[in-house]
């Protein structure tokens, strides 16, 4: 389990969110069988999504989704997080790898390549606010800071770090986001810039001094007052963070509706049932022939649950009007697509 801290620095001129995500990133690595550099890429994105969720989400039921589409061998990644510290994510090519940089560090930028960062904010009403910005470096932290400035008009510093060891296991992972509040004093900004310039990097600080020690170095001379989260029910004064997927056995079975009855019957004949793998978390769901044959022609939106296709009383099928769901997701029906395994 990870944890998230929140607070203010510089006499209230700086809003700070920090996360320790070692266990979360290691679980993602294990679930998806990630290469070392893919681990760093997804780990940075998952940590960054947790930070942005604290900075941007206004209500408990909102979610934020980061989509990185690049020209590099990774093929892209997708991460989703909420304000409760829940995060999940995946990459398109989990075993993709590139040589180390000249300084011996993992080359996340080359693995991601040139492209764009898309950020979706999903509201309880089903509305989705989307913003897309070009990737600055593909290293994730710079790209998120660029997004905050270009799309949210929030000047921020974003630091993300993932260190792997041995066979690729995650040794340490975490991140910090510092948001400059309106009217911040010049001396506060000057001190923050000087501290950032003197930092040896976030990952060494996390490894040697932990999350609190990293914050002390980053905010030296600025003071850091932690937000009291106990009033919100977080008795340890921090938000627990964890890898948490919203998939379940019922949703996995519904995914088989995207196959025709003939295709499902072929699964039963050849495989003795059906198998569905969640692309978000890698969980495997197996279904018996009886379960597969019990499916009815009903398709719901994977995000908001709205009915897309359902049987009417006369036996015919009714289809949702339009090509976009109320939550903003593109409507995909069995004759139009196949689910991602």
Swiss-Prot record:
Protein keywords: Chaperone, Cytoplasm, Disulfide bond, Redox-active center, Zinc
Localisation: Cytoplasm
PTM characteristics: Under oxidizing conditions two disulfide bonds are formed involving the reactive cysteines. Under reducing conditions zinc is bound to the reactive cysteines and the protein is inactive.
GO cellular-component term (any): cytoplasm
InterPro entries: Heat_shock_Hsp33, Heat_shock_Hsp33_C, Heat_shock_Hsp33_N
First-listed, main subcellular location of the protein, grouped into a coarse class: cytoplasm
Pfam family, one: HSP33
Keyword Lipid metabolism applies: no
GO molecular function, one term: unfolded protein binding
Keyword Zinc: yes
GO BP annotation list: protein refolding
Record-annotated disulphide pairs: 245-247, 278-281
Family of the protein in this entry: Belongs to the HSP33 family.
NCBIfam families reported in the protein's UniProt record: PRK00114.1 (NF001033)
Functional note: Redox regulated molecular chaperone. Protects both thermally unfolding and oxidatively damaged proteins from irreversible aggregation. Plays an important role in the bacterial defense system toward oxidative stress.
Protein name: 33 kDa chaperonin
Natural source organism: Thermus thermophilus (strain ATCC BAA-163 / DSM 7039 / HB27)
